[in-house]
Amino acid sequence: MPLINLPEFSAELLSEFDARKAERIDTPVIQPAEPFLDIAGEDLRRRIFMTESETGASLCLRPEFTIPVCLRHIETATGTPKRYAYLGEVFRQRRDGANEFYQAGIEDLGDINIPSADARAIGDATGILARLLPGRRLSVTLGDQAVFEAVVQALGLPLGWQKRLIHAFGNMTQLEALLAGLVSPQFVTGLDDDIARLIAAGDEQALIAHIEQEMQATGYSTNASRSPPEIARRLKEKLVLSETRLDDAAFHVLEEFLSLHVPLVNASAALAGFADAAGLKLGNALSRFNGRVGALADAGVDLSCLDYRAAFGRPLDYYTGLVFEVTAEGSSAVLAGGGRFDRLLTFLGATDRIPAVGFSFWLDRIETERAAA
């Protein structure tokens, strides 16, 4: 179906994609809802337009392109490396602006040279924007979830707390609430006395048997709710997490890390200095970060317009490393955003691990910037 009401610069944009050897791909507007509900993140989940098929399968209007492009790649059993380009409508409930709008972007799948692919994504996003917005100086904010994960792991927190903090990365309100809970734990109350005793005794089999007995007695079906072993595991994890306290020194280390905001050219030294002062070994995460900075310089990207902010993330749960957003200098409107999503294709059903990075353009915002020039 032909697209209508496309921005007037669409032909120029598609020409830029062609010049970067990205193959144009189309994906259905109606998508299976499950992948988005499972891994797209709370911010996107609450904006999705849901529907269902005649058979009751949950469907949605396409809210973004990364997951559909990855699903299409898996369905067609296409080899890698592969670069895809897309331009089409997405549908999201928004407070401001239309609920349907155009996005375009590139997904770069299967390039095992991670620093080079990351640098290419940032270089392509800024390079194309520079062509569409001649004379406008751009500003890029860059974060790295892998570095945050390395800091959290090096502090030796329980795995459950690590998962919670990593899941909240990029959402400072949620992250601050979790850190407050670590500093001043709220102990679990209201547990059944028998359950509390079995958890304290560490008798997992007896705990599972007790939960199963209670479920049968109260008429809960394991088909309609969590299984007894899963409930037991979650109860134990909840109790462990509630009893974990982050000491003041570790709390201040996390605070100091999250406050880092420096020009990218100074970021490697700032991270190394932070790790040394805190006594943390960040190993591969730092070397990968440094490799990306070097690759950006080698690719000719103007590093003077790039900032590193340690607390910066994007509200999509599938990112695993690099995340970035591009604005016009002096404006808060995000014109392009992207990052690395190395686990996404495996989660969606790919048999092999496929490293991936990509970015998308907000065409309505670019159109506004062009009109204001």
Swiss-Prot record:
The keyword Metal-binding does not apply. Gene3D superfamilies: Bira Bifunctional Protein, Domain 2. One of its GO terms (cellular component) is cytoplasm. It comes from the Bacteria. It is found in: Cytoplasm. The keyword NAD does not apply. Pathway: Amino-acid biosynthesis; L-histidine biosynthesis; L-histidine from 5-phospho-alpha-D-ribose 1-diphosphate: step 1/9. Keywords: Amino-acid biosynthesis, Cytoplasm, Histidine biosynthesis. GO terms for molecular function: histidine-tRNA ligase activity. One of its GO terms (biological process) is L-histidine biosynthetic process. Belongs to the class-II aminoacyl-tRNA synthetase family. HisZ subfamily. Required for the first step of histidine biosynthesis. May allow the feedback regulation of ATP phosphoribosyltransferase activity by histidine. This function is generally fulfilled by the C-terminal part of HisG, which is missing in some bacteria such as this one. PANTHER family: HISTIDINE--TRNA LIGASE, MITOCHONDRIAL-RELATED, HISTIDYL-TRNA SYNTHETASE. Heteromultimer composed of HisG and HisZ subunits. This is ATP phosphoribosyltransferase regulatory subunit. It comes from Rhizobium etli (strain CIAT 652).
